[in-house]
A protein has these predicted regions:
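Single conserved hydrophobic/aromatic residue that forms the stacking wall/gate
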Residues: 1-7, 11
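Hydrophobic alpha-helical segments, especially N-terminal targeting/anchoring helices
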Residues: 3, 36, 64-65
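Structured beta-strand/loop patches that form or line metal/cofactor-binding pockets in enzymes
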Residues: 30-61, 78
């Protein structure tokens, strides 16, 4: 294929059969950020994420440690969720829960969850009080982007030194 044809693939969007994040379509490629230490070694991986909450699409980033499994943080930069309820995704106390949590268990199964009840300590984020649909949306979008239709293959390649 010619260069212009390959370049245009970057902007192609594909429909999703399994769409828990309610985004309808996703691009074939995404910009990821690899933060490096002064010595050039990998420090953090920052991945773009988005998905529907209650009133809006939440756009943000999830930062992972270099192992691609330990969460360093989650930040949304755009949303229109209800102030005092779903907009609590911006609350520093709620965001602090993400640091140190693990995406996957030792078998590589995606386990991270946003829920009212704690199932697995290393993988649990408390749901937002009074904002069930926003909490479900965050849970769904994180699972989507960290799963098979999202960045799972990239993260596995990263862990194997192939990314």
């Amino acid at each position: 294929r010619g260069m212009s044809s390959a370049a245009s693939d970057v902007y192609k969007r594909q429909s999703l059969k399994d769409d828990p994040a309610s985004i309808g379509r996703r691009t074939n490629f995404a910009t990821v950020y690899l933060l490096k230490k002064e010595d050039g070694s990998l420090d953090k991986v920052i991945l773009p994420i988005h998905g529907y909450g209650l009133w809006s699409t939440l756009y943000g980033f999830i930062a992972l440690e270099k192992n691609g499994n330990d969460i360093f943080g989650l930040q949304f930069y755009q949303h229109a969720e209800t102030p005092g309820l779903g907009a609590e995704v911006d609350n520093p106390k709620w965001k602090a829960q993400w640091k140190g949590k693990k995406l996957n268990n030792d078998s590589g199964e995606l386990m991270i969850t946003v829920a009212k009840t704690q199932k697995y300590k290393d993988h649990h984020i408390d749901a937002l009080a009074g904002a069930t649909l926003t909490s479900n949306g965050v849970d769904n979008l994180v699972k989507f982007w960290m799963g098979e239709s999202g960045f799972k293959k990239f993260l596995k390649n990263l862990q194997n030194g192939a990314a």
